[in-house]
A protein has these predicted regions:
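TRNA-recognition modules of translation machinery and tRNA-sensing kinases, especially anticodon-binding
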Residues: 26, 129-422
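N-terminal alpha-helical targeting/anchoring segments
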Residues: 1-134, 152, 156
Length: 422
């Protein structure tokens, strides 16, 4: 969440940076400043009136002690009049404060100076590519055909149990999921990340703290009876471990990893985008999260990008890294790198990870702070990334490694899967 002081002291710069994200309501910045002015005015009026009441009450006490009842009574009338204005002032202050908070949470995070201009995914900048695109033999098929051929996922039964977009993994398909999750977690923990198994539902405060609410209200599954939300990513519960927390500077950086199922409504998707495992409502993902000092957060971002890149190299998958343009960035992000893997049978790039620096946007919302060397309270910076999201990784592993008598698996998965081939 942006701070009013930032908007007030850097108004034009804030508007320019919001324009990079193509934010449609730049006038909201002026509205927020005006609401803050009104809040301060009302607070000053309330404090002045309350001070008069307090001072007069003391004076009444003195007069009564001196036997000056008549003088005390005359002041009581003034006190009564002042007190009658306090309650309406409180109510007006509460309304203005609510209007201020409702307005400020609509503002997205400000983009870093490194964010390229642009509106659509076509404007994202390819930073680098790696791996070798496979040359498939004639007759190679997309993963949705391979899934049927090798009986790995049952979409029809999943749809019967729940609905479309809820796949039922079975046999070697389920085993491959488990192997990937275990490998990803081992890879992350060996790099110093502490593993967590978080709750897969969160309350409203947690969803607000990481920026899912109110921005993604309609994209999340909401259990209204208890006002809980199914998580769209492990980022939400794991980052909230440090909500309302003051950490010691020597504990930073805090490195966390977690596996979770993820639930997303994904309304509006159609066509090739939703074939097979390309886009589903429930999927598995392993996440990495770091909390660190502000001056180190962009070095940490580079470290996390390299971490995910090396993981993809071990899977022997062709990939590319993109720096997202302003129009394609997430609401909470200051800078995001996307990883895409080449799907040889579909002849297209599929996103498998996003790695983002949120700077202090999330930590202001969740009140995650630390004391610096001078004993001054500072807001930490938070970062997260997918390491990795499974469905499209599975799709590309199946497609890119298909041979006449099965599907070859990368060497790093052999001991986890128990075999070199499906």
């Amino acid at each position: 969440m942006l701070q009013v002081s930032v908007l007030r002291n850097n108004t034009e710069d804030v508007k320019k940076r919001l324009a990079v994200k193509h934010f449609a309501q730049p006038e909201l910045v002026d509205t927020i400043i005006a609401l803050d002015d009104e809040r301060k005015r009302l607070q000053a009026e309330f404090d002045t009136t309350q001070a008069r009441v307090n001072a007069a009450s003391k004076e009444i006490g003195k007069m009564m002690a001196q036997g000056n009842k008549e003088g005390a009574e005359s002041i009581k009338a003034d006190v009564g009049n002042w007190k009658t204005t306090l309650e309406p002032l409180k109510e007006e202050m509460a309304k203005v404060e609510k209007d201020l908070q409702d307005a400020i949470v609509i503002l997205p995070n400000l983009p870093s100076a490194q964010v390229p201009e642009g509106r659509t995914p076509e404007d994202n900048v390819v930073v680098r590519e790696g791996g070798i695109k496979p040359v498939l033999s004639e007759g190679a098929v997309p993963h949705w055909d391979l899934i049927t051929q090798y009986d790995l996922v049952d979409f029809e039964t999943g749809a019967k149990i729940t609905g479309r977009g809820f796949p039922l993994y079975k046999g070697k398909g389920a085993k491959l999921q488990r192997a990937l999750v275990q490998y990803f977690l081992d890879y992350n923990t060996e790099a110093g990340y502490t593993e967590y198994i978080p709750p897969f539902m969160v309350n409203e405060a947690s969803a607000f703290a990481t920026g899912q609410l109110p921005d993604k209200e309609g994209q999340m599954y909401h259990a209204t009876a208890d006002n809980f939300y199914l998580i769209p990513t492990a980022e939400v519960p794991v980052t909230n471990i440090y909500r309302d927390t003051i950490v010691k500077q020597e504990e930073l950086p805090i490195k966390m990893t977690a596996y979770s199922p993820c639930f997303r409504r994904e309304a509006g998707s159609f066509g090739k985008d939703v074939r097979g495992l390309n886009r589903v409502h429930q999927f598995e993902k392993v996440e990495i999260i770091q909390i660190t000092e502000p001056e180190k957060s962009y070095d940490v971002l580079d470290e996390m990008v390299k971490h995910v890149e090396k993981l993809l190299l071990t899977l022997e998958l062709p990939y590319r890294i993109l720096r997202l343009c302003g129009g394609d960035m997430g609401f909470t992000s200051a800078l995001t790198y996307d990883f895409e893997v080449f799907s040889a049978a579909q002849e297209r790039w599929l996103e498998v990870s996003s790695v983002s620096n949120f700077e202090s946007y999330q930590t202001h919302r969740m009140k995650c702070r630390y004391k610096d060397a001078d004993g001054k309270m500072q807001f930490a910076h938070s970062l997260n990334g997918s390491s990795l999201a499974l469905p499209r990784i599975v799709a590309c592993l199946l497609e890119n490694n298909q041979v006449a008598d099965g599907i070859n698996l990368p060497e790093v998965l052999h001991r986890y899967f128990g075999s070199a081939k499906i």
